[in-house]
Amino acid sequence: QPCLVPDTSPLGQLQGGTNMIVLEGDAVGQIVLRGAGAGAGPTASAVLSDICDIARVYRGTVFGEPAKTLKAATPALSQRPAAYYLRMSLKDKPGALAKVAAVLGEAGVSIDRMRQYGHVNDCAPVLIVTHKTTRADIDHALAAFGATSVVDGDPVALRIEEV
């Protein structure tokens, strides 16, 4: 699922064809693995590695256990609270912003920041950053926006990861 990351985080500072994985653990803190991820060399290396694994009928193990028997103990992404970036176009009507705030409040979503830009064709782009909430609450609000007469088109919602 696409998301936004702070530009001050290791992931936010990536440039070019570099790939990165950020791992966090209680005992070790943050571990960052970074390496080439695009271009002729890295792609050829990955393809060759896959061909070798297929030829060897590789069935890898993790910590001495078959990888397919390991169970993930993490909650579904939709259940992990996070801040969200919302972008929508509001019709130029009295009470439009109040209606948006009411819909978010009814869905259990709290607004951290909001910004409205100049009008274009009787509509104004509005950007909202929420406090931490679940994707289910965001989806509830998005569905409710469709029933209002103040939101023009489909709003966009992107998760903001803290890494």
Regions inferred by a protein language model and the residue ranges of each:
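Solvent-exposed residues in well-ordered beta-strands and their adjoining turns
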Residues: C3-V5, E24-D26, S89-K91, H131
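Glycine-rich phosphate/pyrophosphate-binding beta-alpha loops
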Residues: V5-D7, G29-I31, G35-G41
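A short, polar/proline- and glycine-enriched secondary-structure boundary/capping micro-motif
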Residues: P10-L11, P42-A46
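Glycine-rich, aromatic-lined ligand/substrate-binding cores of catalytic
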Residues: L14-V28
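A conserved regulatory-domain signal marking ACT and ACT-like small-molecule sensing domains
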Residues: A46, I51-V163
